[in-house]
Amino acid sequence: FPDLSPRADDERKPAPLTRAASLQAALGTFEKHMQDEGFSLNTVKAFASDIRLLGRYLGIGTPIGEIGTKNLTDFLHWLTDERGVPCSPKSYARRVTALKVFFGWLHDTGVLAQDPSTAVVQQSVSSPLPSAPTAVDLERALVVAEARRAGADGHKPDARPTLLLNLLLQTGIKKGEAMAIVPNHIDASDASAPMLYIRYANPRLRYKERKLPLEPEWLRVLDEYMQQYRPSDTLFTCTARNLEYVLRDIAEAGDLPVGALSFENLRWASAMRDWRAGVEQDDIRQKLGLSKIAWRETKSKLQKLIDHEATTMA
């Protein structure tokens, strides 16, 4: 390692932000803050773009301490009525969120005595509620999968439907994460408490890596699957589309509604199971691999799904 003198080391450290810092200088520090906090890559890019747009309106060299609530309100009015570029309700809502996160961070870290974004009104944007299979749907699906596993009706025994369905319900992982699993990501050293490690090759996505518990019975299904398919690389030897077909076939055989089983729907079903079981909300967030920003909307939708389910069952 190079022998850096204290002076040389100090020169490498960015100067602390003050209220006199420019919007551009604050944005650079804000981007690093978002990365350190585990914001998703898309969120970092979107929020940075939104703050640059504010800089385009106010002037990128504007001192952050001179930006008030009226400046932000005027900026939002410019976005919707004067800029000449369409601003959808969803984009508008995200930009308001970007302002609140940016100036809230400046206030929380003591750079600004007051948060000018506090009084900015966040307009709600209605987005469709996701669908998730009901408990009855899942029971039917699991019965079908177990029948396939046992080789019922003269079919060749196939453990893959049971393996896939239970994997998604127990972990809530995404399709891409499922496709990236290799057998050594599964820790079966303690058969009573097996674990799945979700890995990412991209260093910028390492914050999404996590360890997820699996039920012991799943290991027995895994053993059958490994004997039947003998994967040489990734756990699933087929394409993602083929796995989607597996889920679709289970749904059809179980007489479930069209589209009831998908990677996305089962991810919601997994989160709902944890929510009903009283799992801590931050534990659910981490299980799903979501940033704190992304969790806000997901949490709201989960609550609505649970409420809708309760109303339907009443």
Predicted regions: what is each one?
Residues L142-K175:
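Basic, Lys/Arg- and aromatic-enriched nucleic-acid-binding interface segment
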